[in-house]
């Protein structure tokens, strides 16, 4: 397993990566990619850290919102995702605030602005993701960025892999974790991959479900475009030209 920490960011021996799955974690980001037949994992502090290792046309799936509204209205892709995850996992799709709201640096300010714009506040869970939402939002406009980046919601992806049926068990439970790992069979021996990550990284930096989510994003990234579903099919574009769409296995 390739290891990258916040203090060692030499990726000279890695790549070019043609497909990657990324999930946020306490230490920054977990990146899953394939090196030959082996699935490797990296933990990086910033999204830009992985750029040099990505092929110019790499397929990158990330569990973080891409495309933000200006008026704080609900994103269509989130509404579709909630419907697809009924009745068990719809709550896993949180409302994504307007770009202006995500730029707030303290919760009272963000909550006040959100209420002023739409009459609805924001959850603290959503607020805690703002730094990562801002980072991704800015990174996607970088001229140096490699790869084609898509938003991927792990629970939507797992539902698709499960015959379009949302998983009733939470990923935080042993049963839910086991079910999700079984659905990742396309990637090979994910049990060993996950265990190597847990043996390498501290729980305060990376959790098992962070790794599992990165892996299902990788599985989606490795699918050819005709074997992917895009929600919605006629995705709207935000003010910065970013498509508001969620990708999943077809």
Cite the ranges covered by each PLM segment.
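RNase H-like (RuvC/DEDD) metal-dependent nuclease/polynucleotide-processing core
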Residues: 2-19, 24-250
């Amino acid at each position: 397993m390739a290891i990258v920490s916040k203090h060692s960011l030499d990726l000279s021996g890695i790549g070019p990566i043609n497909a990657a799955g990324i999930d946020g974690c306490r230490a920054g980001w977990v990146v899953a990619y394939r090196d030959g037949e082996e699935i490797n994992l990296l933990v990086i502090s910033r999204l830009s850290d992985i750029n040099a290792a990505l092929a110019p046309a790499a397929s990158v799936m990330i569990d973080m919102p891409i495309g933000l509204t200006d008026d704080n209205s609900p994103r269509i892709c989130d509404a579709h995702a909630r419907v697809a995850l009924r009745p068990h996992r719809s709550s896993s799709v949180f409302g994504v605030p307007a770009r202006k709201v995500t730029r707030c640096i303290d919760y009272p300010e963000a909550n006040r602005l959100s209420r002023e714009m739409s009459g609805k506040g924001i959850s603290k869970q959503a607020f805690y993701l703002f730094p990562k939402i801002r980072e991704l939002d800015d990174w996607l406009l970088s001229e140096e960025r490699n790869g084609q980046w898509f938003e991927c919601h792990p629970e939507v992806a797992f539902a698709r892999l499960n015959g379009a049926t949302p998983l009733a068990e939470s990923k935080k439970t042993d049963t839910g974790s086991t079910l999700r790992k079984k659905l990742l069979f396309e990637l090979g021996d994910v049990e060993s991959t996950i265990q190597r990550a847990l043996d390498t990284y501290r729980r305060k930096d990376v959790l098992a479900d962070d790794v599992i989510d990165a892996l299902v994003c990788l599985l989606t990234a490795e699918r050819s475009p005709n074997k992917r579903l895009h929600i919605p099919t006629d995705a709207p574009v935000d003010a910065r030209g970013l498509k508001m769409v969620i990708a999943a296995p077809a």
